[in-house]
Amino acid sequence: MKSLKMLYPLFMLLVLSSKIDLSNQDVIDNILMSLSKGITYFDMQGSNINLDGVVGYIILQAQLREATRTWPHSDFLSLSQRAAAISMLKRLSKSLSTAASTLQETDPKYFKEFEPILDSSFWSLPGEWSSTDPSLVYTSVRAMECYDEHMSDKCMTFLLGTWKDNGTPCIVTKTCRDTMTQFGCPHYSLSHQLLYFMIGTMKGCSKMLKGDLRLSRVNITVGHYKRIFCSNMMKSNQDIFKNSLTGQMQDIFIENILLCGLVGFSDFYKLDWLQSILTWQDQEAGCFGKEEDISHIFEEFLDAPHKRVKRREKTLTDGCSSHMTGVAVSALGGFLNFYLSEQDITKRPII
């Protein structure tokens, strides 16, 4: 039985890769089936999932709301797919309420610091699509992370205004600005540089680069930084997909798709990438990262080992990864909205 279970991802990959001519509705069906399993898992384990995992499901909630709002009513199949999405959204909303209450009780400090992003209305979805630029890829990348999770959290709470009770939002210290605009960062420090600017934009912080006196950066806008980071995250994903699609790198691969997709870079929504992600889901539990020890890939990004279970990673009792499950379902929500927009010629990618 164990051997059959281990062969399932390979079987799925062969089946999916053989369907090169999948229609958008076929792809949407596959995404909805995967999301249904992921939400069923959250129904059962939501109270045990950490903050990062819950944020992933919060983003999925925003994506499902947008999907059901804009779903093309073209035929019976499309209507039945929308009905399935509405049903999942109702289930998810109920489970999220319970999960948020549990987080507030079990992890009050982190809950308070990141409470604003635990509301799906905080997250804005792309209104139009763009593509990354290979010419913006760094000539060299650091071997180690540029900063740790403590620094990342601190800078983001300055933007959110949660660094103290009734704190002023949109504070950008020189240290945070210099850290979050440093070029050549890899992995999680790169994706969190993008997340920093995403949070600032969604919070309404319009002067994030004010005071940057570096002549080499004088013409670089927030939008340009996002394009630089996502262009490098695209290169990272291409390298990962080509060389090392193991449990160790799957998490960062999916996180890059999630974040850059939210910024509006449609070239992250590649069909073969989606097909691979679908094979990584445990078909019985509905989670991601099961039986893969991915916790060690966060070590550089953590300022102390004991924080591993707080936000960045938590391996649940069933062996599933809290972080990877959260980013995977929200990335799949992004794929869903992209393929729905592909049926709407007004939302086709901008060349």
From Swiss-Prot:
It comes from the Eukaryota. It is found in: Secreted. Its main location: secreted. Keywords: Secreted, Signal. Residues 1-25 form the signal peptide. GO terms for cellular component: cytosol; extracellular region; membrane. Pfam families: DUF4735 (PF15882). Transmembrane segments: none annotated. InterPro entries: DUF4735 (IPR031751). Homodimer. Belongs to the UPF0764 family. This is UPF0764 protein C16orf89 homolog.
